[in-house]
């Protein structure tokens, strides 16, 4: 599938689920700096291969927020995709929640107000913060993974590496002690 076909498929699924916008962060469930290919959902939906970015797809727009380190790369990789670059390092660039609320207020009131995210890609605090900010602007955050049902062909598997234990001399605390603290 091309980027345009992926965006069309995502929008069709969004309509089916009653979703107005979908946020696709360039992260994994562990907030890892170096993530496994399986979790490169933002790259898959936009074509942008940079290490930092977040995509927002609405029923009629597609945008990518990234910082100044990736502007040139993003411009080149987004060419021909209909994905608009949002230069988040620029002083006048709105945050994603600000953009969503403003865009909703400026003419899409007749559409649904649901904003979907895959909750696995957010920390608990990050999710709560986003939910609260969107609610204040009249939008509803919903937990729906909209990418996995679409990215079925050629998606790399989740790695199955063995676990290993860091010795206490490196961590400063035993496994037993850590487990006791969380129980």
For each feature predicted by the language model, list its residue ranges:
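Short, basic, low-complexity termini and linkers enriched in Ser/Thr/Gly/Pro
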Residues: 103-113
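N-terminal accessory/capping or targeting/presequence segment of soluble
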Residues: 2-104, 118, 122-183
């Amino acid at each position: 599938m091309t980027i345009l076909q992926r965006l069309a498929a995502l929008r069709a699924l969004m309509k089916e689920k009653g979703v107005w916008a979908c946020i696709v962060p360039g992260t994994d469930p562990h907030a890892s700096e170096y993530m496994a290919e399986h979790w490169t959902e933002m790259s898959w939906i936009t074509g942008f291969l940079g290490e930092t970015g977040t995509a927002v797809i609405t029923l009629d727009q597609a945008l990518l927020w990234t910082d100044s380190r990736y502007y040139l790369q993003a411009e080149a990789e987004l060419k021909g995709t209909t994905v608009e670059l949002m230069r988040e390092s620029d002083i006048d660039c709105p945050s994603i929640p600000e953009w969503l609320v403003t865009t909703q207020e400026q003419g899409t009131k007749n559409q649904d107000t649901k904003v979907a995210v895959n909750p696995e890609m957010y920390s608990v605090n990050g999710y709560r913060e986003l939910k609260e900010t969107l609610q204040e602007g009249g939008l509803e955050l919903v937990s729906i993974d909209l990418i996995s049902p679409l990215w079925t062909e050629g998606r790399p598997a989740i790695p199955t590496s063995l676990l290993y234990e860091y010795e206490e001399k490196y961590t400063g605390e035993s496994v037993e002690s850590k487990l006791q603290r969380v129980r």
